[in-house]
């Protein structure tokens, strides 16, 4: 991959969505997963054997399409350089564009974000994408336990996603005014009820977090809540001893439940600098700090302004939301050298294609056609590489990312210098 994790993951997810939507006319779509470190000559030999065996397919059309797909994959393997540290995934097959006779060969070569572990060869009516789902899952998980005498919340933070797993209430009475033996007896009952509540929290925490710990995906536990209850819970033996070792810190909070988790993440931000959620939040807050300055500071936003400044090499960090939905289209004349690049909303591509049929070349009057379509984020990533600009693709699941999407049409930037 290119080295920009947010861009790479966005493009990988986009490819996965596209692949899952492809369907062959018959059992003729080929999926090949090449493990990291596997010799390509071994894979090629296996495919040549499959090519030979495909001559036994009864349907001549299916046989021809399967053989064409295998040959395309063999050609792509020749272009790869060993060793492949991550392995490679190749999909190829004839995809119908409409009725009979509209099939066109499509091939996809993906470099996975994590090493491919197992060799797979699959011939089916759909591309085999199940293993790709595992690659897009965030592997690091933080466990969260919010607790006070009345209620508790157990949850996880995984990448940008906050998940509440369990909410508990104690039924423990509050303080009271009384005296004598009755008061002492009630106090013992309250303490016992509080103890039993802590035991329940510990049991649910063990049930929730131990499987994640055993998979080696639990990065740590964060404990929070109002008052001293959280400290008692952390210090005593309510948690499984292996989970106690994973406690990162405890935090004083005003709230429990999901809002309390967000409050905890804010307070724990110094500890969670590497968490995607905090990196995005800090970057977008930096943009807004520039924006609210009287002269606009080092901020830029909107498609026209950002594209202009990026071409000048003036952007330090480009922020793009994953829902931007723009395609960079290269249009050419079939009669002369005229070329034009335009940004088109992805959901309006069919309309753009229809309009292009009636549009004449401004230079010679010839017919125009689409030469290339590219996702705008992929296009921007290539420009950023040229100008040594950082590009961050942010989720709209967060409040900050949603603001960038709504207010600035999904595109904002922090400049290197004032323009």
UniProtKB/Swiss-Prot annotation:
<dbReference type="InterPro" id="IPR020918">
    <property type="entry name" value="Peptide_chain-rel_aRF1"/>
</dbReference>
<dbReference type="InterPro" id="IPR005141">
    <property type="entry name" value="eRF1_2"/>
</dbReference>
<keyword id="KW-0648">Protein biosynthesis</keyword>
<dbReference type="InterPro" id="IPR042226">
    <property type="entry name" value="eFR1_2_sf"/>
</dbReference>
<comment type="subunit">
    <text>Heterodimer of two subunits, one of which binds GTP.</text>
</comment>
<dbReference type="GO" id="GO:0005737">
    <property type="term" value="C:cytoplasm"/>
</dbReference>
<dbReference type="Pfam" id="PF03464">
    <property type="entry name" value="eRF1_2"/>
</dbReference>
<protein>
    <recommendedName>
        <fullName>Peptide chain release factor subunit 1</fullName>
    </recommendedName>
</protein>
<dbReference type="InterPro" id="IPR005142">
    <property type="entry name" value="eRF1_3"/>
</dbReference>
<comment type="similarity">
    <text>Belongs to the eukaryotic release factor 1 family.</text>
</comment>
<dbReference type="Pfam" id="PF03465">
    <property type="entry name" value="eRF1_3"/>
</dbReference>
<dbReference type="InterPro" id="IPR004403">
    <property type="entry name" value="Peptide_chain-rel_eRF1/aRF1"/>
</dbReference>
<dbReference type="InterPro" id="IPR029064">
    <property type="entry name" value="Ribosomal_eL30-like_sf"/>
</dbReference>
<dbReference type="InterPro" id="IPR005140">
    <property type="entry name" value="eRF1_1_Pelota"/>
</dbReference>
<comment type="function">
    <text>Directs the termination of nascent peptide synthesis (translation) in response to the termination codons UAA, UAG and UGA.</text>
</comment>
<dbReference type="InterPro" id="IPR024049">
    <property type="entry name" value="eRF1_1_sf"/>
</dbReference>
<dbReference type="Pfam" id="PF03463">
    <property type="entry name" value="eRF1_1"/>
</dbReference>
<keyword id="KW-0963">Cytoplasm</keyword>
<dbReference type="GO" id="GO:0016149">
    <property type="term" value="F:translation release factor activity, codon specific"/>
</dbReference>
